[in-house]
Amino acid sequence: MKTSIQQLVAVLLNRQVANWVVLYVKLHNFHWNVNGPNFFTLHEKFEELYTEASGHIDTLAERVLSIGGSPIATLAASLEEASIKEATGGESAAEMVSSVVNDFVDLVGELKVARDVADEADDEATADMLDAIEAGLEKHVWMLEAFLE
């Protein structure tokens, strides 16, 4: 029987599954709809990021399963659970990049909370996985902010 702290780990991981599903679609939206002088750079970057998002979805969902949970697996459930919001459409290239930066910063904060809960549950594998995702996001934030300067 799982303790309440172990159940909370699964809930927090599922939030991240949902966030990455929404972000995956958002990044595709930006990839398809970016325009302007930075088209080639951003078109490629958004593809890199949605490919990475796909890997995070799978890794997070499989971790939920491995700790006895059930991963969110529908778009409707993802939209309901996610803290990340869909793109509204019509964003400029700079607004797209700013939106991704803001989403990544928010995710870093949520990942830190989830990692602390995983640490409390003595779930080192989950904590390590979350640390790795966080480190990647922090690097992306740095690079994308440099692009916006």
Swiss-Prot record:
It comes from Brevibacillus brevis (Bacillus brevis). PANTHER family: GENERAL STRESS PROTEIN 20U. Fe cation 1 binds at residues 31, 58, 62. It catalyses: 2 Fe(2+) + H2O2 + 2 H(+) = 2 Fe(3+) + 2 H2O. 12 di-nuclear ferroxidase centers are located at the interfaces between subunits related by 2-fold symmetry axes. It is found in: Cytoplasm, Nucleoid. The 12 subunits form a hollow sphere into which the mineral iron core of up to 500 Fe(3+) can be deposited. Homododecamer. The gene is dps. One of its GO terms (biological process) is intracellular iron ion homeostasis. Its main location: cytoplasm. PROSITE patterns: DPS_1, DPS_2. This is DNA protection during starvation protein.
